[in-house]
């Protein structure tokens, strides 16, 4: 008699799970092969987020055994749908080491690896989760954006994200994820780096669902409690989206220095900079030269350039959550030191200054620039180095990261620096022709000169080697447009019109002459 209930239970389980289990059982071996090849190095053989590379990553890789996922269309605390998992695998997670796999793996491989990932957690054996209905965004306007800002303040979003949305709120230095690892509040001015998407709808969905495993909560309960309305939460999403450019910034290889007939800007806040185009330069962690750095705080710098025919001015701006050194960020530094001690030795126990380096080929017209990480002893780079404490800029020769010799003699550079609402703005100015052309490049109009950038956040444990770097780009000084460029088209139009009028009049005279000589037609 005892065997009959067991048989019935087995039959019931087979009826309930049979079709789904058969699909999963078929997919899992194929998914395991994909996972072992492409995923286990970070996420670990058993999906616990403990792969051999995990110590080099912050945030740490996802622990699939916990069943906790940030990017979902489901309610807070629920599992993601298969579509949610597929989205993250396809697109990756900006700001983390997780890349998108759309171009690397086939559709079938991605579906197979989803089935295998789900096998790591017992929570996926239940009913499939369902996405919440978020409706559609209401129309926007200046008044709607202003209302969004008001609700942003009401919900105290500024405590983490800051008054201006730079991720520099008073709580920002204390933020940790569910695994007690330090985690940055998002910079709301860089929507192209938002996890889960950058549209108003994507942002609203994150507000409704939260980012499980992080300090970012769901605000669905605030709506349910009638503290705010659903429309007001949409307004917050619209306000947040308004802080970023409409389109992700295009990365261009050439920075054009605008030629001005007026005086060069007096500093980074000078309104004259409105006439110079801003170029976005992405930065990545310096992971080539030891000590390497896998957790940079700065991911991009905006560069503007202007010259007046005798001097060149560069304006550089980047988000920085602190003006280092800042005692409010001592707790953050302690957590970063604990999290990253396995990577090429410990960080400094106290904060250093914020740093900026702009490097050039030492001579104009070189076909190949030096090594992009500060040059080398064989081929040095010319470098401008700025520090926040003390606020100073120096030009000199670099023979590698952290290997810098300042120029002797009178200073060649002038500068002005400004820290405003979580953003550094630095202007550096120099004569086009340096005092010593054997050690520093001349800036020649109508000729591109290689240029590269390095930024370090002292509050994040960064220094002259541990920081964020760019590839080589080029700065090109515009030339005055010759008068003939403006005059020649006008003259051509006048000559063409005059010639056309002359031909018409000649044709009319011939026609009248023909009529007189042949009056009967």
Q: Residue locations for each model-derived region?
A:
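Extracytoplasmic electron-transfer domains, predominantly the class I c-type cytochrome c fold
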Residues: 56-102, 107-118, 174-241, 336-338, ...
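Acidic/polar low-complexity flexible segments
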Residues: 249-274, 330-388, 435-519
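Beta-strand-rich interaction surfaces with strong enrichment in secreted/lumenal proteins
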Residues: 301-304, 413-419
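Electrostatic cytochrome c docking/interface patches
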Residues: 23-34, 124-153, 247
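Exposed beta-sheet edge/beta-hairpin loop segments within beta-rich domains
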Residues: 415-422, 440-444
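The canonical Cys-X-X-Cys-His
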Residues: 31-46, 113, 117, 148, ...
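Short, well-ordered beta-strand segments enriched in hydrophobic/aromatic residues
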Residues: 311-318, 424-432
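C-terminal segment of classical bacterial N-terminal signal peptides
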Residues: 15-23
């Amino acid at each position: 008699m005892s065997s009959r209930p067991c048989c019935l239970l087995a039959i019931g389980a087979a009826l309930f799970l049979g079709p789904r289990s058969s699909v999963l059982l078929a997919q899992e071996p194929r998914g395991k092969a994909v996972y072992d090849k492409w995923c286990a190095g970070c996420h670990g053989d058993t999906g616990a987020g403990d792969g051999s590379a995990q110590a080099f990553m912050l945030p740490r890789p996802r622990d699939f055994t916990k069943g906790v996922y940030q990017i979902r269309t489901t309610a807070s605390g629920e599992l993601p749908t298969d579509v949610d998992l597929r989205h993250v695998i396809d697109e990756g997670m900006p700001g983390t080491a997780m890349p998108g796999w759309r171009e690397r793996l086939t559709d079938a491989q991605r579906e197979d690896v989803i089935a295998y990932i789900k096998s790591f957690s017992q929570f996926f054996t239940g009913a499939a989760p369902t996405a919440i209905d978020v409706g559609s965004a209401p129309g926007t306007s200046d008044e709607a954006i202003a209302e969004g800002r008001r609700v942003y303040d009401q919900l105290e979003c500024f405590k983490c994200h800051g008054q201006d949305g730079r991720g520099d709120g008073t709580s920002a230095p204390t933020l940790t994820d569910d695994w007690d690892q330090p985690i940055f509040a998002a910079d709301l001015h860089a929507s192209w780096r938002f996890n889960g998407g950058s549209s108003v709808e994507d942002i609203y969905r994150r507000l409704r669902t939260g980012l499980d495993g992080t300090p970012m909560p769901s605000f669905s309960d605030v709506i349910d409690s009638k503290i705010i309305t659903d429309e007001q939460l949409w307004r917050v999403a619209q306000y947040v989206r308004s802080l970023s450019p409409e389109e992700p910034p295009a990365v261009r290889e050439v920075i054009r220095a605008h030629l001005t007939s007026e005086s060069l800007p007096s500093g980074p806040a000078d309104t004259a900079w409105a006439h110079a185009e801003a170029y976005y330069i992405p930065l990545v962690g310096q992971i080539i030269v030891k000590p390497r750095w896998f957790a940079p705080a700065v991911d991009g710098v905006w560069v503007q350039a202007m010259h007046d025919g005798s001097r060149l001015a560069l304006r550089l701006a980047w988000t920085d959550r602190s003006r280092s050194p800042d005692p409010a960020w001592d707790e953050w530094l302690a957590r970063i030191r604990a999290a990253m001690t396995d990577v090429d030795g410990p960080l400094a126990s106290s904060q250093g200054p914020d740093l900026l380096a702009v490097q050039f080929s030492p001579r104009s017209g070189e076909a190949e620039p030096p090594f992009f990480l500060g040059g080398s002893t064989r081929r040095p780079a010319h470098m401008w180095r700025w520090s926040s404490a003390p606020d100073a800029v120096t030009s000199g020769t670099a023979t590698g990261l952290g290997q810098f010799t300042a120029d002797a003699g009178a200073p060649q550079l002038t500068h002005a620096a400004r820290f405003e609402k979580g953003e550094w703005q630095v202007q550096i100015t120099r004569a086009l022709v340096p005092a010593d052309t054997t050690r520093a490049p001349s800036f020649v109009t109508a000729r591109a000169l290689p240029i590269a950038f390095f930024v370090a956040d002292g509050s994040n444990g960064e220094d002259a080697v541990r920081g964020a770097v760019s590839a080589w780009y080029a700065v090109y000084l515009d030339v005055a447009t010759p008068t003939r460029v403006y005059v020649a088209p006008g003259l051509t139009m006048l000559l063409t019109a005059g010639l056309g009028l002359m031909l018409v009049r000649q044709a009319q005279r011939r026609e009248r002459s023909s009529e007189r000589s042949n009056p009967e037609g």
